[in-house]
């Protein structure tokens, strides 16, 4: 099940709308490379999310018969990763019979200069030594960390996709996918997307495939959910009910809770959501692999965190085989808090009761000294002194239980 924004992505520059200026600049730049006299070694392609930066680079490679060597700079952030791209580009010849290569470094503004030591320097070295044209993409090219990159590149800006081109695109998709979309709903999607074609198409797909039609009520409900973080119960429902990998991953990355706690929530509720034992096994298998990647990521290899998110969300969602059937419908289940949280809560309540008793004992002594020296003996003889200490019912119940254990 392919995502629609990939399925309907323009393959050629002539199909890319509303970017005439950027297309002309890129064509002149790539032709200067092919003529052996590049006017710049690298281009920094910038613009808001979803305007088609990566698409434009791919279309350029397609039209000029160039092999695209792509890397996400915010995922592969170490100096050796960047250098690896240069080595592959310079050492290995093309196996596709193309006339050359085009190197694409996506999301360079996602590099954290504190954590990803040497990444920017690695890119600068790559630009200096490259034998092939380089395109970098960024949402925010004015990030101070990119100052040196800006000085070494030709900057090409992209426009937001206008309302009319976006409307044509969405109507084309609705017609191809046989999806009924109300005009009011279409207008709402276009307005809320603010020129982000990927956002608009994902919303159209999420509602269209889930409900078979796109209405204003459904679109407004989905937009409201995107404006806030999801609570754990909403997150679970969106993961377990997801038919597409991107839907599950969006739910995981929009959760109010962190990844450690999310794994506990998912683990607790897999047997509740899935009735088939094989589905349960596949879900736990994906979750266990997510835990392994998460542990390794915490060890310093943070590139693996994205794999952990993929497995705990998309991997768990894909465990239910019935979803592949066209008439599949999600089952509503009542989820529960992780038993781990319940145990912590119960344990805290017990400790609080114990501490209140110790405070009553520790009139002429420190809390810790009373806990370690006096309290163990008090448990044996407490019935002789409970009236003096004015113990309440909860404290008496605790002492009765503690003295028997």
Swiss-Prot record:
CDD domains cross-referenced by the UniProt entry: AAA, HLD_clamp_RFC
Bilayer-crossing regions: none
KW ATP-binding (keyword) present: yes
MF GO annotations: ATP binding; ATP hydrolysis activity; DNA clamp loader activity
Keyword Nucleotide-binding carried by entry: yes
Entry superkingdom: Archaea
InterPro entries linked to this entry: AAA+_ATPase, ATPase_AAA_core, P-loop_NTPase, Rep_factor-C_lsu, RFC_lid
Keywords: ATP-binding, DNA replication, Nucleotide-binding
Chain sites annotated for binding ATP: 47-54
Signal peptide start and end residues: none
GO process terms (BP): DNA replication
Pfam family, any one: RCF1-5-like_lid
Gene3D superfamilies per the UniProt record, alphabetical: 1.10.8.60, P-loop containing nucleotide triphosphate hydrolases
Function: Part of the RFC clamp loader complex which loads the PCNA sliding clamp onto DNA.
Record family assignment: Belongs to the activator 1 small subunits family. RfcL subfamily.
Complex formation: Heteromultimer composed of small subunits (RfcS) and large subunits (RfcL).
Name of this protein: Replication factor C large subunit
